[in-house]
Regions:
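Soluble FAD-dependent oxygen oxidases
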Residues: 1-214
């Protein structure tokens, strides 16, 4: 039964698409809290984020240092009040800055200070990703593993990142669509990059990626 559901969910990708429909959604104001944090701070923020309501989401990227984004969408007075109660906790991290935007399109991602884009036309890259549930009490172990992975990264173009998918993905919505729903909170990924045509560096980088993921 599960296999059949998965096939039905994948059907649009196997078919010839002749028509599509677009539906717009209401654009709401967004508060963004962002900045560099250390690993201990990341651990605390991840623990808090697993209690976030569905209108708040944490994303982070670990390149040379850890940079986080927290997005909070403001929809109604009651939701806004609850949202601010969660965000008050973040006042204890002085390096984080707050910005307010009228809509999502105004937001700029990944500041130049991250120095991510040593990546260029002369680089090739590979990404590996997977969905995962709440870490809960395993957050300290996750942070320890993350630090070990980054200690071994082969060059400055490689990084690890994760996106919090949102509250609704924690719920099993069996039968709500033809897609197979999984209880998921986090979408971590590893980005690996190497110089074009440098097979030796490619092997080192890919070995790092596979070892990190295993």
């Amino acid at each position: 039964q599960l296999i059949w559901e998965a096939i039905k969910g994948a059907a649009p990708f196997f078919s010839i698409i002749t028509e599509i429909g677009l539906k717009t959604i209401q654009s709401n104001p967004i508060k963004v809290i962002e900045g560099f944090v250390n690993l201990n701070e990341l651990s605390l923020i991840m623990k808090l984020s697993e209690e976030f309501p569905e209108n708040i989401s944490l994303q982070w990227i670990y390149a040379q240092k850890v940079y986080i984004y927290i997005f909070a969408e403001f929809k109604s007075f009651l939701e806004d009040k609850r949202t601010e109660e969660f965000l008050i906790f973040l006042e204890k991290f002085p390096a984080l800055k707050k910005s307010f935007y009228e809509n999502f399109n105004e937001i700029n991602f990944f500041p130049k200070e991250l120095k991510l884009y040593e990546m260029n036309a002369n680089n090739h890259s590979e990404v590996i990703s997977l969905l995962g549930g709440d870490l809960e009490n395993d957050i300290p172990n996750f942070i320890k593993c993350l630090n070990e992975i980054m200690d071994k990264k082969p060059n400055n173009s490689c990084y690890v990142a994760s996106q919090q998918l949102g509250c609704k993905t924690k719920k099993s919505n069996h039968g709500s669509s033809f897609f197979v729903h999984r209880k998921s909170t986090w979408k971590p990924w590893i980005y690996a990059s190497w110089k074009k045509n440098d097979l030796q560096e490619k092997k080192v980088v890919m070995d790092w990626m596979y070892e990190s993921w295993s």
